[in-house]
Amino acid sequence: MTNILSPEKSENDQELPIRPSYLQEFVGQQQIKENLLVFIKAAKSRNEHLDHTLFYGPPGLGKTTLAKIISNEIGGNFKSTAGPAIIKAADLAAILTNLEKNDVLFIDEIHRLNTLVEEILYSAMEDFELDIIIGEGSAARSVKITLPKFTLIGATTRFGMLSNSLRDRFGIPMRLNFYNTEELKQVLNRASKLLDIDLTDSGSEEIAKRSRGTPRIALRLLRRIRDFAVVDGKLRIDKEICDFGLKRLTVDSIGLDSNDYRYLKFIADNYHGGPVGIETIAAALSEQRDELEETIEPYLIKIGLVKRTPRGRVITIAAFEHLKMPIPNKSQHQFNILNENE
């Protein structure tokens, strides 16, 4: 699924020269920032490495950025890879043996590590040792390699898919949450200054309200609205040009797009509001289940349009009202039951 409101990273997002380098520049996630400052300061004062850190939560909230910031704050090199890229034990060994003291190894999508690689990672995280097999057959022998004290930072959007053994080895687990409108305005205002964009307060507010609580989406929308402003001869990005551009991008007043409407209308039209299983929804919409669970559902659940139940997905009264559709009696009964159980 590729669209303007996808929280997943795209190649175009990487061109923005606005990534903060230190915690004081990072907007939002205030409690995480404050705690990280304490943990980093304490590790430095003891002349120790920072404990292994796990960032989890919806995509687009700053997990990679925070990993790079930690590297800058502790003064180590930053090495980056992804779970699916580490196929064999030898791949992991090559990465680990090239680390230096206080380096940060960032593994994105760490929930996608295969079991064999994950088991080798345990001793590297706990004991800073790596056991590798040299040779084959009867000539094979195990060699223990001592690793420098490094910090592993894992990132995942699927916390529940991590094994307990891997989760327990992270001394600093941190959940990143969606941003509120004011925080997104701060992100946009900072970016507009760095990109030399004249963004009004009303324009910033309009983009922030429709960015699904996600900085990556807010910055992407800012770039696209800048395009509309340039072509339209506008020197300033205000509420009017934002509203025009966002309508052209089919982003509605609360940040929903055509993919969200397809999802909601399928449940409303075909199942009277639900419940309906996620596999059925994915098949009907020709989407992967993971895509729905990671890019569409989190925001719809956050704003109260969808509920996950043991029997499947249910859309709420608020969803019917936003769709401007009548509420079926069957669904009304289900909503009453759900509300009583909350």
Curated annotation (Swiss-Prot):
GO terms for cellular component: cytoplasm; Holliday junction resolvase complex. The RuvA-RuvB-RuvC complex processes Holliday junction (HJ) DNA during genetic recombination and DNA repair, while the RuvA-RuvB complex plays an important role in the rescue of blocked DNA replication forks via replication fork reversal (RFR). RuvA specifically binds to HJ cruciform DNA, conferring on it an open structure. The RuvB hexamer acts as an ATP-dependent pump, pulling dsDNA into and through the RuvAB complex. RuvB forms 2 homohexamers on either side of HJ DNA bound by 1 or 2 RuvA tetramers; 4 subunits per hexamer contact DNA at a time. DNA binds at residues 289, 308, 313. Transmembrane segments: none annotated. It comes from Rickettsia typhi (strain ATCC VR-144 / Wilmington). Its EC number is 3.6.4.-. The keyword Nucleotide-binding applies. Residues 253-342 are annotated as: Head domain (RuvB-H). Keywords: ATP-binding, Cytoplasm, DNA damage, DNA recombination, DNA repair, DNA-binding, Hydrolase, Nucleotide-binding. Belongs to the RuvB family. This is Holliday junction branch migration complex subunit RuvB.
